[in-house]
């Protein structure tokens, strides 16, 4: 499945009563909430002696993907385009791959 296919399928479950502004707000709030749930799983593993709950973490990553798709939809941009723009930025920042020097003195 491509990112655009995922976005199109995921958006069939979008609340149709929301306008674009509300979709955007819901998307970014959802991203924060789901990222927090993912962090909590890792925190329990690293700091509280729990086994890493890989399946729960994968489910949370799926929720992050849904809210990312929703946020991109609200901005009228495809996930493929979001990711392509990110790769362009990373190539400018780290043209030869990651280096601490480029990280410290990174190009924006």
Language-model features and meaning:
Residues 1-61, 65-108:
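Flexible "arm" and connector segments at domain edges
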